[in-house]
Design a protein with these regions (language model features):
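Extracytoplasmic
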Residues: 543, 562-563
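Generic hydrophobic alpha-helical segments
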Residues: 88, 169, 463-467, 543, ...
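Short secondary-structure capping/turn micro-motifs that flank functional sites
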Residues: 332, 518-519, 538
Length: 563
């Protein structure tokens, strides 16, 4: 069993004691391999996000190193991913590049707080229809942003809005570049063939080097990184603190939450994939802290938001990575490219990168999940469809917010269907099931009701059935809570209101059998003041005994009855 200190140590530190030359060689091979795979992806994500390609490489170097060095996963690879493309585009369009840097740092702080407070496990509570909906939507948007480069269209500006973007593309189809289209579709075909038949061969590397060589050798008339961006500078930029704009901090909080939640979801999903492939078990809280530190640091070097990258992580594991050192070597490999081979990168054709991103969009789309979603309830289908639609036509922040609200209402509705408030009748006592009331006759002066399931907001109205015909109730009403699995403030208030109604009619309410969570919460809320501590019993036998004591005393006439 790990010590409390070890629970907060990065995997890189925990695995150092068993590190050796054999593991280093394996990490070196895997790190260089995944570094070469990451190069075209980092540039493609940056260009798709509306920033120069070096921003993606800087992000991959800085965050890739920090996430591996400080994270809670053995083989996780961090860096820019397709999930952030749409968000980054929207933030830059609204707040500019400094707004993006500020938003990324805010998201980093939120991720650190989530890790420190132990919220790493909270990601599992995101409903599947919401996750599938926004990944479907992001995939559609990424593909739509790459149509211009895939077909070599001459467009000065690509609108940020989906429908305006598609309209502008349709208007400029006459500018299609046949050579660029061929390069783009050949690149996409190579990616598909590698994924289908040559799973151990990184298609992105073949496409990047092959297309670059073809453009250089045959002088193909296609747009390249150099013709659009003027090449990539050698070396890392100087550390620069972004210009913080205090008046925008409140406006940036909402997109920062989106970046943080999206980063947390993707990084922990990626870590789970890594665990399944490597047989390891990641530490979600340490992983979130590392993700946060990486996102706080990335903007200082002009980098993008980052998270765990599922495809690169899988490549890392398949390439034989043994420890987080492989992830650090991946970052150093990218640094070596920037330092010694930056001039060569300018010849990479944008059509080839578009082909790579089309494949990325397809892979991240979770398309196989759609038939499964369609088998679920109408509410789940509505949550998925609305999240997908809003992601495409509005923005990801709104899509996730609306999706989560609808999913919450769906959850409440499903919970309400499982909670019952029913009277314990003779049929219940004699139905043959083993329970404490078996073979015991309930006196006529007692009515026993049981609450079965969670008694939370949204279901508390069911208790009103008890008092629908209050005049017909006997003098004593016992509420049995043995099968009530949970309660909240609304549930306690409903029980208090029931007690008040019964007391006003001259009746006595007893409660019994509360489980630890409901009992503790009811005690903290001062529930005893409403029914009397002597009327809260541990079990039904005590409640029946207490009822007999009350019945044996002279009592005034019950309201609503006649003598």
């Amino acid at each position: 069993m790990s010590s409390p200190i070890e629970a907060w140590l990065p995997k890189s530190v925990l695995l150092l004691r068993e590190y050796n030359a054999e593991k280093f060689v394996a990490d070196l091979i895997a790190g260089v391999t995944v570094g070469l795979v990451a190069l075209p992806l980092a540039m493609a994500f940056a260009i798709a996000s509306g920033v120069p390609p070096q921003a993606g490489i800087y992000c991959a170097i800085v965050t890739g190193f920090l996430i591996s060095a400080l994270g809670g996963s053995k083989t996780q690879i961090g860096g820019p991913t397709g999930a952030f493309v749409v968000v980054v585009l929207g933030i830059i369009a609204r707040y500019g590049i400094d707004g993006l840097f500020t938003c990324t740092m805010l998201a980093g702080v939120l991720l650190v707080v989530m890790g420190i407070t132990g919220l790493g496990g909270m990601v599992k509570f995101f409903p599947r229809p919401v996750v599938v909906g926004f990944t479907n939507g992001i995939a559609v948007l990424i593909a739509s942003t790459q149509i211009r480069d895939l077909f070599g269209l001459r467009m000065e500006h690509v609108p940020g809005d989906f429908f305006h973007r598609m309209g502008a593309i349709a208007e400029n189809l006459h500018t299609l570049n046949g050579v660029a289209t061929a390069v783009g579709f050949i690149s996409l075909s190579v990616m598909i063939l590698c994924a289908k038949f040559l799973k151990r061969v990184p298609g992105a590397i073949l496409v990047c080097f092959g297309a670059t060589a073809a453009v250089a050798i045959f002088h193909l008339p296609v747009e390249t990184i150099g013709t659009r961006f003027g090449g990539i500078p050698s070396g890392l930029p100087h550390i620069a603190i972004p210009r913080l704009q205090p008046q925008l901090l409140l406006h940036l909080l909402s997109p920062a939450v989106t970046v943080a939640m999206l980063g947390a979801i993707e990084s922990l999903f990626s870590a789970v994939v890594s665990d399944r492939m490597s047989g390891d078990k990641h530490n979600p809280n340490v992983e979130l802290i590392a993700q946060g530190v990486a996102n706080i640091t990335s903007p200082l070097f002009g980098g993008l938001p980052a998270t765990g990258a599922i495809a690169r992580t899988a490549t890392n594991v398949r390439s034989g990575a043994k420890t987080p050192v492989a992830g650090m070597i991946h970052a150093l490999t990218l640094l070596a490219v920037i330092l010694f081979a930056a001039p060569l990168v300018k010849n990479v054709p944008l059509a080839a990168l578009a082909g790579i991103l089309f494949m990325v969009a397809y892979n991240m789309g979770d398309w196989a999940e759609i038939p499964e979603i369609l088998k679920l309830s109408k509410m789940d289908i509505s949550v998925w469809l609305l999240t997908l639609t809003l992601t495409v036509v509005a923005d990801l922040t709104l899509a996730v917010e609306v999706g989560m609200i609808l999913a919450a209402f769906s959850f409440i509705r499903k919970i309400s269907m499982t909670t019952t408030v029913s009277k314990v009748t003779d049929e219940y006592i004699e139905d043959g099931r083993a329970h404490i009331l078996q073979d015991k006759a309930i006196p006529e002066y007692i009515a026993v009701y049981r609450i079965h399931g969670p008694f939370l907001f949204g279901v508390t109205d069911k208790i009103a059935e008890i008092t629908e015909d209050i005049a017909s109730l006997p003098p004593i009403v016992i509420i049995r809570l043995r099968n009530m699995t949970a309660i909240d403030a609304t549930g306690i208030a409903a029980l208090e209101e029931l007690a008040a109604q019964l007391q006003a009619s001259g009746r006595t309410m007893l409660v019994c059998g509360a489980r630890p969570q409901p009992a503790a919460l009811m005690h903290e809320a001062g529930f005893e003041r409403h029914v009397g501590g002597e009327n809260i019993c541990e079990n039904i036998n005590q409640a029946l005994k207490r009822a007999a004591e009350i019945h044996s005393r002279p009592v005034p006439a019950i309201a609503g009855t006649s003598c």
